[in-house]
Amino acid sequence: MAKTLYQKVFDAHVVREVEGETPLIYIDRHLVHEVTSPQAFDGLRAMNRQLRRPDLTWATMDHNVSTTTKDIAASGEMARIQMETLAANCKEFGVRLYDLNHKYQGIVHVMGPELGITLPGTTIVCGDSHTATHGAFGSLAFGIGTSEVEHVMATQTLKQGRAKTMRISVNGKLAAGISAKDVVLAIIGRVGHAGGTGYVVEFAGEAIEGLTMEGRMTVCNMAIELGAKAGMIAPDQTTIDYIRGKEFAPKGETLEQAIAYWQSLKSDEGARFDAEVVLDAADIAPQVTWGTNPGQVIAVNEPIPAPESFSDLMEQQSARKALAYMDLQPGQKLSDVAIDKVFIGSCTNSRIEDLRAAAAIARGRKVAAGVQALVVPGSEQVKAQAEAEGLDKIFIEAGFEWRLPGCSMCLAMNNDRLQPGERCASTSNRNFEGRQGRAGRTHLVSPAMAAAAAVTGRFADIRAL
């Protein structure tokens, strides 16, 4: 029987499947951070259990960390406790930890791929909803809750039902200047922020195949934002070239054997998907969200839609509420809207290619008066590479703040946040009410669009700069 990529990876990991019961699958990689792990470690301790596979477990500090200092207490008492607890737990249970002073420290979903921890055909979990990022490699990667974190720690397995399958194809070539972030925002705008609920989505088509690995990670990172369980992209030569030579990647003959297997990881001809969506790459323009979920998105040169333009009553109500929260009007152009802050970072867009794209816009320009602009590299490795290329100097000379790695302003769990009423052009993945700070107003954009907003003081079409 013809199988999809998802079905192949899922089936390869089934440990036990009995009729009438949820399948038990093996987990190949477990990524851990300071926020969702403390209770899981406590659970192991309470039952006198050991960690089943410390060699398949990696931990880092990212959510709570300060991006201005390596001081563990800089983000407050709760943050300090969580990070100190993670360090103590990792020491007790034998987990490798990349703490604030380690050269591999960074956002967990940036760290995993750049170190070769993330590999095609593997199952990867983390107590974080954007674990879908790793699906860019053809892995089955998804976020789990703290009780499931404990279950994986104790057994290296997880009960998982089979999801429905959706293929989203982006056909044709992207226009110049259109990024992976624009692609995925356009997809979410088309499918809706809940359109993928119950599905594992495979992204396909010429435009997806033409993306770099970092671009593919951006797309899969936001699969959760259309409601999907996970997002996947079939591995190819681009994937193999990216993995080769990474710290934890296979080497020598083992790598060649792995490549032979990875090349089989694609949906078979005739494989049946439960849903299919097709977009034309030529139709995708630079995107900006206007509302309070990622599906409320338009091209930068389009007017904000009227609530009455939506056929669904719930969508109409959501649009009215979003416009009120965002202090926007139907018909208004986002190019006429001034901003207060810019955030370039997060597990969606903090990799070296993202910083290069933003720096290309920032070069020779200045941050607009009254705008605070932060650039937060996704890891120490990214930071070092950017500094070796002189990107930090470009940003600093333009008036951006060059920060230390961390989740930063993506979520209001550290000192980087919006004040009530502040409007932010952000390269992160969520624009929910209060996501970046109480009563803050978030607009999701690509790194280039964020840099353009910083230097113009409002949302600007990068094609016109």
UniProtKB/Swiss-Prot annotation:
[4Fe-4S] cluster binds at C347, C407, C410. The keyword Amino-acid biosynthesis applies. One of its GO terms (molecular function) is 4 iron, 4 sulfur cluster binding. It is an enzyme of class 4 (lyase). Keywords: 4Fe-4S, Amino-acid biosynthesis, Branched-chain amino acid biosynthesis, Iron, Iron-sulfur, Leucine biosynthesis, Lyase, Metal-binding. Pathway: Amino-acid biosynthesis; L-leucine biosynthesis; L-leucine from 3-methyl-2-oxobutanoate: step 2/4. One of its GO terms (biological process) is L-leucine biosynthetic process. Binds 1 [4Fe-4S] cluster per subunit. Pfam families: Aconitase. It comes from the Bacteria. CDD domains: IPMI. Its cofactor is [4Fe-4S] cluster. The keyword 4Fe-4S applies. Its EC number is 4.2.1.33. It catalyses: (2R,3S)-3-isopropylmalate = (2S)-2-isopropylmalate. Catalyzes the isomerization between 2-isopropylmalate and 3-isopropylmalate, via the formation of 2-isopropylmaleate. NCBIfam families: leuC (TIGR00170), PRK05478.1 (NF004016), PRK12466.1 (NF009116). Belongs to the aconitase/IPM isomerase family. LeuC type 1 subfamily. Heterodimer of LeuC and LeuD. This is 3-isopropylmalate dehydratase large subunit. It comes from Aeromonas hydrophila subsp. hydrophila (strain ATCC 7966 / DSM 30187 / BCRC 13018 / CCUG 14551 / JCM 1027 / KCTC 2358 / NCIMB 9240 / NCTC 8049).
